[in-house]
Every structure is written in structure tokens, then in C-alpha cells.
Amino acid sequence: MSVSYNRVIVAFCEGQHDVAFLSRILLVNGFLLQDLKIGQLPPPFDKRFEKELSQVRIPDKKLGFQPNGPKLPSVCFYNDGNLIFIHNLNGDGRGRERVELVTMYKELSGTDDFSIEIAYRFLYFFDADELGIDARITEIKNEIGLEEATQLSNGSIIDFDGSEWGGYIFHDVQTQLGTLEDQLLGYFYNKNQQLQQDILSFLQTNVLIQERTRRFISSNAGESYSGRSQYYEKKSVLGMYAQLQFSGVSNAVLISNTDFLKAVDINRC
């Protein structure tokens, strides 16, 4: 990677849906996806990420494990001196992992003759869920270590401890609660209201008993259901859109490629 950077933006996401949505936003705003091998990333990140991979104890892993854990970014973007790394934390309750990532990045910056001084911006992306926007913002403030009186609003950026910090909470516009799926389905609904109503009608007409939405285990020892219900109506609605456009793909692939989400929607976020 031959480009030079003057600021590194690190985004922490709950899941792959968030990564896909943020990637759409960045592409619309002129950022370029850096489809690079780890060794092609600019220093000092190339060596740092190589080190993270080298520390994976392969013999301790089971077949099918994914080596690129949260300490390796899912994607990298660049535009006008801004280098962006987006991390998928696989859940909101990953405070320890986020703190470790902040520490990892900050350790790469220094002011001596042998170090590179790096200007960082750390961004946190969460769903409001049933907690609401204010409660999520408070969680971010506590994790960063901000004093209670420090003002941090949804979508704002502040300076603290030598870096910039901010967060955005995905939510339903009407209730101020909910998830990224609520925002996406709002955009999709505006494109074709009848289609979304038909999808909801199909799902609600054919709803299964809750037991059948749990993991089903079938072996020579017998058959049984395990764990909690895995049915979430909003995710299923997105899944129906996905199958109408791109058979067999995940919701994250839908978010990355669908024309139910256009630049005009993204620019209104």
C-alpha cells in the first residue's frame, strides 16, 4: 500500500451486518476498499497484524475455526489521508476485547525517533435494542473512561486522552429503540411498501412453534432441540429480501449489494 495516512479511524461493530452497512456508507462517500494482503498494509499495522496471526495456537483450535478474530480488522478503507479499519466484535458485550484493541493500536504510536506518531479516532457502533440511545451512549462513555459531565451525543466526536472518540447507535426513528435492521427495513419499505407487507404476512402466517426455532440435533442417540430460539422476525424479513435478489446469500451480502439501499438513503443517515 503506497498511500500515506495522517489519521487512523478504528470502528468497532457488533456484527457483520454493521460492517456491511458501514462499508456501503464509506463507498458512497468516496472511500476506497483496500483489498490487500496483511503484508501489504502500511507500517506499523502490517507487522502488528502479522504478529496477531502468528500468536494463534493452531493445535489448540478445532476444525472450522476462523483465524481472523476481533484483533484483525474485517475490512480496510482509505480516502484523503484517512485510513479506516473496521472490526467485527461479534456482539455488544465485548468490552474487554474493545479495550484490548484500543491498547493495541495506541501502543503502535509514539513520539521517539523509532516510532510513528499516529492520530487516532475510535468509533463505537451499537444497536439501541431495548436500552435506548442514551443508555448506549452512557455505556460508551464508561468504557472510554469519560467523566459523567462530559458531553457525548449520538454521532458526535470528542477529544480525550490524546485521541478522538465517538459513537453511533442504530435505532428505529419512531421509537428511538431497536437495531440496524429497523433502519434498513425503513429504507426498504420506502422502495416497495406492498412487498414488505407481503413478506411480513407470509412470515406471520407460517410462524412455527417456538421449539422448532431452536437448534435441532439428530444422531444415533436420538433427536432433540437445544439452546434458545433463533428466530428474529426482522432478520427473517431481511432474509426474504436477500432470497428474492441473490439466492442463497446471507443478510450481510444483501446489505452489501442490494438496490433497496441507495446513496440517497445513506446520505440521509
Q: Which residues are covered by each model-predicted region?
A:
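Hydrophobic, Leu/Ile/Phe/Ala-enriched alpha-helical segments that form helix-helix packing faces
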Residues: 26-30, 105-113, 140-151, 188, ...
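Domain-level signal for Mg2+-assisted phosphodiester chemistry and nucleotide/NA-binding surfaces
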Residues: 1-107, 143
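Extended, hydrophobic alpha-helical segments
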Residues: 109, 161, 171, 265-268
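Activity-critical C-terminal alpha-helical subdomain
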Residues: 117-254, 259
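Short, flexible coil/linker elements and helix-boundary hinge sites characteristic
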Residues: 30, 37-39, 109-113, 192, ...
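Surface-exposed acidic, glycine-flexible loop patches that form ligand/cofactor-binding
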Residues: 2, 106-118, 157-158
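C-terminal tail/extension regions appended to the core domain(s) of diverse proteins
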Residues: 70-73, 83, 90-97, 101-102, ...
